[in-house]
């Protein structure tokens, strides 16, 4: 099959033929329909998330079940599915406790580029090729069955592909924030996750929703999707602006940028006694200093949120799509053939895309 393979960090991806094995126990082979391109993939390409190459990335996958391994019961060949970027084992303590987004088994292998048994299902010329959270930049992908959710026949598979990360992470952020109807919320970062969060906040009954970013066209999109106010942090002091808009700061700040400046912005702008939810992922080795005294004296609650629960939250997201209360296609700014993936990567790196779909 064809796949976009990274051989060297910071070098273009290579489109080449690779071998894919049969799915093992609990695994599912998918014929890929579309895969969203996310900044987390770019972090792999740049070596900021150091998954060992050669590696095939791509973790917002939609497609058709081609084959199932022994013991698979949740899906069958022919099913239309989306894959979450989190692949829960379903058996560890966290999975059993309902926190499958924090699966202990998955956490041990997600940055190694292998399946839970320590091996990959891709190879070429007898050498293993690793995958990042599914390896969807290819014609086929193999993932654990617990990552998959069936998609109704009347729903466009391309439209829902980005639910696997952008949608699921936005949903998880709101669940962690425990917002009440009418609460004021600031969302820092208006990429795929931030814009998903804004749509889902509107669906959840949030009051004032403030979008913070640096690109006017993305802030305009945020207003279209449910933001009540926007702050361009390149043009004005964002912390001062957020506090002025909210009369002292929002009850909740959701940080979706994943860098030092935006994390500090979130901590500095939240209301005394408020909550900061961190969902943006910095590079895996990043260390960010914070003023702990301000957090303690302000009674600020800081919560880290990693994605959402595939088996619990993904069906709820699909229902919101069906009801017309969440439209993931509004995040998609481009559609590229697999052979054009390097062009899509460049656009995302330059801030000229939100989500691009890669079509094998």
UniProtKB/Swiss-Prot annotation:
Q: Where does Zn(2+) 1 bind?
A: 38, 59, 165
Q: Which PROSITE patterns match?
A: ADH_ZINC (PS00059)
Q: Which cofactor does it need?
A: Zn(2+)
Q: Which sequence ranges are marked TM in the entry? A: none
Q: Which GO terms describe its molecular function?
A: oxidoreductase activity; zinc ion binding
List the catalysed reactions: succinate semialdehyde + NADP(+) + CoA = succinyl-CoA + NADPH + H(+)
Q: According to its UniProt record, what is one Pfam family this protein matches?
A: ADH_zinc_N
Among SMART domains, the record links this protein to: PKS_ER
Q: Which residues bind NADP(+)?
A: 189-194, 218, 279-281, 355
Q: What is its EC number?
A: 1.2.1.76
SUPFAM superfamilies attached to this UniProt entry: GroES-like, NAD(P)-binding Rossmann-fold domains
Key word NADP present in the record? Answer: yes
The note describing how and how many cofactors are bound reads: Binds 2 Zn(2+) ions per subunit.
> Which UniProt keywords are present, listed alphabetically?
Metal-binding, NADP, Oxidoreductase, Zinc
Detail which positions bind Zn(2+) 2. Answer: 89, 92, 95, 103
InterPro entries linked to this entry: ADH-like_C (IPR013149), ADH-like_N (IPR013154), ADH_Zn_CS (IPR002328), GroES-like_sf (IPR011032), NAD(P)-bd_dom_sf (IPR036291), PKS_ER (IPR020843)
Question: What does the UniProt record say this protein does?
Answer: Catalyzes the reduction of succinate semialdehyde to succinyl-CoA. The enzyme is specific for succinate semialdehyde and succinyl-CoA, and only shows low activity with palmitoyl-CoA. There is no activity with NAD(+) as cosubstrate. Participates in the 3-hydroxypropanoate/4-hydroxybutyrate cycle, an autotrophic CO(2) fixation pathway found in some thermoacidophilic archaea.
What family is it from? Belongs to the zinc-containing alcohol dehydrogenase family.
Give the PANTHER family listed for this entry.
Answer: GROES-LIKE ZINC-BINDING ALCOHOL DEHYDROGENASE FAMILY PROTEIN (PTHR43350:SF2), NAD-DEPENDENT ALCOHOL DEHYDROGENASE (PTHR43350)
Supply the name of the protein. Succinate-semialdehyde dehydrogenase (acetylating)
- Native organism is Metallosphaera sedula (strain ATCC 51363 / DSM 5348 / JCM 9185 / NBRC 15509 / TH2)
